[in-house]
Amino acid sequence: MAAVKFLVCSVLLVVLATQSEIGLAQNCSAAIGGLMSCGPYVLPGNQLTPSTQCCSAIQAVNHGCLCETINIISSLPGHCSLPPVSCGTA
């Protein structure tokens, strides 16, 4: 469990460090940092309901910031010479 939390923190730090626009990175940095309260909810196999803190953090994040962050995370395998991740396909 600690290793997964470390991985989540590491990914978030990489995402924040690689934002292409400084203004967006500064605005997203605090908002994305707030998403750490959602950590237990995003782990595979959990049966938890998101906490009030998590829901508040999600509400505070700009839609563009979320999309940009998801795009950056999705590109990580390619930057590590790994095949792309394809969710929902066999």
Curated annotation (Swiss-Prot):
Disulfide bonds: 28-65, 38-54, 55-80, 67-87
Family named by the database record: Belongs to the A9/FIL1 family.
Signal peptide: 1-26
GO cellular component entries: extracellular region
Family matches, as InterPro entries: Bifun_inhib/LTP/seed_sf (IPR036312), Bifunc_inhib/LTP/seed_store (IPR016140), NsLTP-like (IPR044741)
Protein name: Protein LIM3
SMART domains to which the protein is assigned, alphabetical: AAI (SM00499)
Cellular compartment(s): Secreted
Keywords on record: Disulfide bond, Secreted, Signal
Lineage: Eukaryota, Viridiplantae, Streptophyta, Embryophyta, Tracheophyta
A Pfam family this chain is assigned to: LTP_2
CDD domains for this protein: nsLTP_like
